[in-house]
Amino acid sequence: MTTQFSVAGVELELLRYPAQQESNLQAWDAADEHLLKSLIESEQAAVPTAIVNDSFGALSCGLSKLHPSWPLFVETDARTSFLGTEQNHGRNQLPMDNLQRFTSRDTLPENLALVLMKLPKNLSYFAHQLTRLSQVLPAGTRVLVAAKAKSINSALLDIFAKHLGPASASLAWKNTRVITCVSDGKPRPLAKEVTWAVPEYQLEISNLSNVFAANKLDIGARIMLENLPKGNFKSIVDLGCGNGVLGLRTAQLSPEADIHFIDDSEMAVASAKANWARNQLPADKGHFYWDDCMTHLPEEVQPDLVLCNPPFHQGEAITDHIAWQMFLDARRRLKEGGILHIVGNRHLAYHVKLQRLFKNCTTVASNGKFVILQAQKK
């Protein structure tokens, strides 16, 4: 894994978060390099700057390296992004007192003079972010968005025009481009929240914009719901909860249990919490954590069941380290006799990992694409 970042005279050591990941993944990409290179070559002044979707702090570290007092306002939905930014500022002995952190639901400051963004995969979420910016940016404010050249097309430029202002793309460099959008100063309203029913379980669900499966059950969740374990569970974790549908259904099946919802996405945790209230479940039985797996779960929480639908993407990277960490955390935190119950794509071969960690693994159900697996802590 390459950890030495070098562009236009800026030298940094950058690691992904958590640091123990596959050796072929690094903490930045060419789009980060292109954005910093453009700023340095244009001799950009250290004005109040929002940094949006900075995966592990490459952009904030780069600007802090250039000017330790550069006022930075960092927005992300991912807890691991905040933790990675802290980690890399520390590794490079860079200050953090010039940096304020925001989730994608927090109110943004109104004194921004420049915005730097990485293009997220989820364009509905991107539109949400542009709309938020339209509510605080004065006319004429530049918003620079770096992305792979192949991701930039007329439809993407139309999203800029609809939600913030006119935009144009730079020439390509290392297969990336920087889009320059100029705010037109017209505030847009945020899109209305979409709510949809899951009639077979008498549930009503809503998702915020960066939550997987926008307005219907995804296939993995559906097969999981059809095969939830039955038992006298007292403490249940919905790990990587998304909109919380698995935990909500489990609460119906085990009304005496405490349900703990955990996700790296702040919007996912907020959606799960809203859905808990929407479905009139007991306020004292639902617990919600914005966290990197179970890293900061209170020690007194000792689940007897962990439900998990592991992601195999982190941003643009395809990786199984998140699933591996989820399984490790489950083994560490489960009570003796507790159960890990997961769904995954068949080709990911999670049964091998579970057999290695738990010394047992049972196939509960499967179809052409997905498999439900269960392992018990003994």
UniProtKB/Swiss-Prot annotation:
Highest taxon listed in the record's lineage: Bacteria
Bilayer-crossing regions: none
Keywords recorded for this protein, A-Z: Cytoplasm, Methyltransferase, rRNA processing, S-adenosyl-L-methionine, Transferase
Single GO term (MF): 23S rRNA (guanine(1835)-N(2))-methyltransferase activity
Statement: the UniProt record of this protein carries the keyword Iron-sulfur: no
Major subcellular location class: cytoplasm
Gene3D superfamilies assigned to the protein according to its UniProt record, in alphabetical order: Vaccinia Virus protein VP39 (3.40.50.150)
Its EC number(s): 2.1.1.174
Assigned protein family: Belongs to the methyltransferase superfamily. RlmG family.
Catalytic reaction(s) noted: guanosine(1835) in 23S rRNA + S-adenosyl-L-methionine = N(2)-methylguanosine(1835) in 23S rRNA + S-adenosyl-L-homocysteine + H(+)
Protein name: Ribosomal RNA large subunit methyltransferase G
Subcellular location: Cytoplasm
Pfam short name (any one): MTS
One cellular-component annotation, GO: cytoplasm
S-adenosyl-L-methionine in keyword set: yes
Record-linked PANTHER family: RIBOSOMAL RNA LARGE SUBUNIT METHYLTRANSFERASE G, RIBOSOMAL RNA SMALL SUBUNIT METHYLTRANSFERASE C
Role, per record: Specifically methylates the guanine in position 1835 (m2G1835) of 23S rRNA.
